[in-house]
């Protein structure tokens, strides 16, 4: 049987838009996990906090569940899929209302041994 060399973590229904989340994910894709954590610590973005927690969870999964070494791990895959959208209305002039879409994201981070 083949040896497992990757681990995954997901954060579902995060209250950040997928478009903004993808901008941060592009910064860490393909980097070593230590470099990725350093990048996320200095990224002033709400999505960066969530991605950092998800990345740490993926690292913990790799170490505890599959016995992988943290020093050898690389962020191999990252993606942000659209979650459920909360629909709200903003009151406007003359008794009308405009729709507001509060978007959510499903963040997935996969780390693997290089």
Curated annotation (Swiss-Prot):
Keyword terms: Ribonucleoprotein, Ribosomal protein, RNA-binding, rRNA-binding
One function term, GO molecular function aspect: rRNA binding
GO biological process, any: translation
rRNA-binding in keyword set: yes
Pfam families: Ribosomal_L22
Highest taxon of source: Bacteria
GO cellular component: cytosolic large ribosomal subunit
Listed InterPro entries: Ribosomal_uL22, Ribosomal_uL22_bac/chlpt-type, Ribosomal_uL22_bac/org-type, Ribosomal_uL22_CS, Ribosomal_uL22_sf
Membrane-crossing residue ranges in chain numbering: none
Similarity section: Belongs to the universal ribosomal protein uL22 family.
Quaternary assembly: Part of the 50S ribosomal subunit.
HAMAP family for this protein: Ribosomal_uL22_B
Name the UniProt record assigns to this protein: Large ribosomal subunit protein uL22
Species annotation: Streptococcus pyogenes serotype M1
């Amino acid at each position: 049987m083949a040896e497992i060399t990757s681990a995954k973590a997901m954060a579902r229904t995060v209250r950040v838009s997928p478009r903004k989340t993808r901008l941060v994910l592009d910064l860490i894709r393909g980097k070593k996990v230590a470099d990725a954590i350093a990048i996320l610590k200095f990224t002033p973005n709400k999505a960066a906090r969530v991605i950092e927690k998800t990345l740490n969870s993926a690292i913990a999964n790799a170490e505890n569940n599959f016995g992988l070494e943290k020093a050898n791990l690389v962020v191999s895959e990252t993606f942000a899929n659209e979650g459920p959208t909360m629909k709200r209305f903003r009151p406007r002039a003359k008794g009308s209302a405009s729709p507001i879409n509060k978007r959510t994201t499903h963040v997935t981070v996969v780390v693997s041994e290089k």
